[in-house]
């Protein structure tokens, strides 16, 4: 119960790509409204929440719209512990797709916003 699974007729690679895209869009919004120092305060919560709702509405029937490996890991683990259906063969869809989507979005946002003067991303710690 609550475990994510692909829809009928959705291939392994289609599902992984869908999870990639969903997480990519979510991460782009997070970067733009929550991480970017020049983002207008007060809109991050509603923007991120509406993006999650939109991704779920679009991807729900195809992949269950996990967009977070932990969202899939917990139900899969409990299914295994409680003797339910074994869905671990699908786990790479929900691990690789979202992680690659988030990484690509972070780099894409940094690249697209760096020269526009709009973006000021936090810098890593420098111990010098």
Predicted ranges, named:
Residues 1-128:
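Membrane-interface helix-loop junctions and terminal tails of multi-pass membrane proteins
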